[in-house]
Amino acid sequence: FKSGSGTGSNFSRIRGEGESLSGGGRSSGLMSFLRIGDRAAGAIKSGGTTRRAAKMVTVDVDHPDIEAYVDWKVVEEQKVAALVAGSKLAQLHMGEVMAACHDEAVSGDDRFDPRANKRLKKAIIAARGAMIPENYVQRVIQFARQGYTEIEFKTYDTDWDSEAYLTVAGQNSNNSVRVSNEFLQAVLDKGDWELVKRRDNGVAKRINASDLWEKIAYAAWACADPGLQYDTTINEWHTCPEGGRINASNPCSEYMFLDDTACNLASLNLMQFRHEDGSFDIPAFEHACRFWTLTLEISVLMAQFPSKEIAQLSYEYRTLGLGFANIGGLLMAQGHSYDSDEGRAICGSISAIMTGVAYATSAEIASEVGPFPQYKKNAKHMLRVMKNHRLAAHGKAKGYKGLNILPVPLDAAPCPDQKLIDAAKVAWDKAV
């Protein structure tokens, strides 16, 4: 956080609420620890700037506390709504009570007696109807007796950086649920799903898979969290499974790799590769991909890592992250809708070119200085994944290996620039 980086963690090893502890007693559960981490992230400004720390929280779909986790932000958002609406209602009705206490049509102390002051009685009834606490109503009347003509009551708004959001929990991370193919099949079959204890792998609870799926869908609709990470598919596309499985991602989810690894990221601004006639400068983009792959490779030895373990694994796997930005701007400038077949074909082609060129450049570097230390024991897995990528870039619907769910291949037909499709194919031919 301090250096301006984000973290991603899978918290599924934490015991569920009520599970027994080795030293006796019961666990306080997953949510108590997540709330602590949330507060810590909110207190630390990322890289010393005004931006808060970036954090991804991931929990497996079979965790005993998964239901509370899914509902977490929904409930917190409701608290914000209650704070905003309640504060404004309280201000309104307390103001009405104060004004009634100073009604000039009523004289003396009768102004503060609802039996004698009909306006005050009406204001009190309205305040009670709006669920304004009785002690607040009486406090206003007491203030009015002392000569005050107005009362201050702080109101809140729904600005994302407002005090209302700072008051509630769960606002300092992206939340995701890791779902497996087994869970998704249980949803389709409308079957039961077992929530598993962390200590002894016993069944903590059986719930209906469809009900949990609906809960996830509603939460995502209501407050944009949690997201989904498809655990089975992610690990089937894992290039280095001999080093362990993939359990989590970085905050934006573009980096998914082994625990205790890190990745330096670089993004290419796609608008810089747009010619005046609207066409995409493929040779310049390929050159930039080669150049930045080399730059990121060099950065592995120059980067500062937060722990010895992360530094060691980053050296052993030499992870790098090359991406692009401004795809929306490029599509708009070219006159294509973001959510269109043409837009998806352009985006898919550019992504395939970038990734294929990066892997081919990596192989070229390896031919000069040797592959990354953990390559040999992962070679067959990496080549399988690369060949699957190549098939997708060529638009193939079959021939994939080691996949339960096949990818959506690159669709050449709607792409307005077939040169992009050709370049994508060539890039992956070279990579493999």
Question: Where are the model-predicted features located?
Answer:
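Inter-helical turn/loop segments and adjacent helix faces that build the functional surface
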Residues: L21, I44-M56, E77-A81, A127, ...
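Extended, regular secondary-structure scaffolds
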Residues: A54, D71-W72, E77-R206
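Internal maturation/activation junctions in enzymes
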Residues: D200-G202, H287-A311, Y315, T319, ...
